[in-house]
Amino acid sequence: MAFGCARFAAVTATKPTITRLDRQQRLLAVGLVLGVTMVAFEITAVLTALPSITDQLHGDSLYGVALACYTLANLVALVVTGELTDRFGPAKPYLASLTVFAGGLIVAATARTMVLVVIGRALQGAGTGGLAPIAYVLVKRAFPVDRQPKMYAYLSAGWVLPSLIAPGVAGTVTDHFGWRWVFWLLLPLIPVVAVMTVRPMRAYASVGTLRGSRIAAAIFAAAGMGTFVTALQFKNIAAAIGGVIAGLTVGLPSLRRLLPSGVHRAARGLPAVVACRMLATAAFLGVDSFIPLAADRIHDASPTIQGFVIIGAALSWTSGQWFMAQHPQIDPRRAVRWGFAMIGLGICAVLPVLSSGWPLWATFLGWAIGGWGMGLLFNPTTVTAMSHARQGAEGLVSSQVNLADAVGFSTMGGIGGAMVALSDRTSLSLPGALGINFALAFALAGLGAICAGHIAAA
């Protein structure tokens, strides 16, 4: 759900504009916003349907893998499409991304095993991962300077409606027609987005300078993180430890090439911003991704109710974004600290969902606090990060921020999934397993509040 808000959350205060857009620019703007809306609906709806999918296909042990593989494929696609866009322009990479996304929807919709769902999710992640950096590039290249802040606002607004209705729609569709239709219903939007965007994109060629390729590093980083996440699911302790070590050995050096130097110690400036994004995504989504599972397995809630529980956080996330857009004078360090504090408070507020006697409406309200915190910190981190981008290198910085989101989400998704799998085959209860994940997320929020002090604009 919320992992995809990070993609399009750069909203800044706007001055009245006088530049008129031509027909091609207007068509492109509508198409880009529709593309964001499509991705937002997919992310939010699938998160709601996933407990039902794993239940029907007996795939609890792959719950975390289904979350993480989407993000890992996203990671590679971010780098690949960013480089292809710099070299060849945005049209062909964007069309290829839409095609891969469509293939992923079809694979998941027809899947008879959880392994095929995981493959479909990986293809979906690869497709949507290509859309985000291209959208940022096009805002810079296709629209006048005085229109760019408003375009970021429109892209962000593309998340509002899906955040409100996708969980409920996905739950209702799953209840009455089956979870496969959650994937099928998105397919008709893809050709519409393609028709509206691809042709106008051909007018905007590359303006950036060619850099050394980072694709190999992205592949190794994804392979390492995938090995790490998969190893966490192994029953054999020795195999799990070996897999974790192998994953870290392959993944960490590659991530160091992809992320700003000094991100591991939250060095002042861009590294601290990227570190905060990674910690925020890990802390928030490490809880948000498992609330529907808790509602399903602990409270025996229907898919509709599972989706409803996380709507509050989605709405408050958007509200927090727009609040920061209207108050750009707030120091980003203060805003990010407030954001992490709200995330931590929200985690404490939803911890009782692990008890079967706790009312789910209280979880709805409690997790809205965490969503507000995410809204407070995402605009300042995005705007501050982009202030460090040199002309022609906006895509590089944008991809680094998005990579941080991917790393944070996939890591906590893998750890949380491992806890769920462990509860299946040991005496550890599911509430206990999720409680460990929630506690780790709370600790990461606290660490993020400390790192926020190193944030600085260029």
Show where each model-derived region lies:
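A helix-boundary/kink motif common to multi-pass secondary transporters
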Residues: 58-59, 89-90, 113, 144, ...
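Hydrophobic alpha-helical transmembrane and interfacial-helix anchor sites in secondary transporters
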Residues: 53, 84, 173, 326-327, ...
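12-transmembrane solute porter fold
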Residues: 25-41, 46-48, 67-69, 79-80, ...
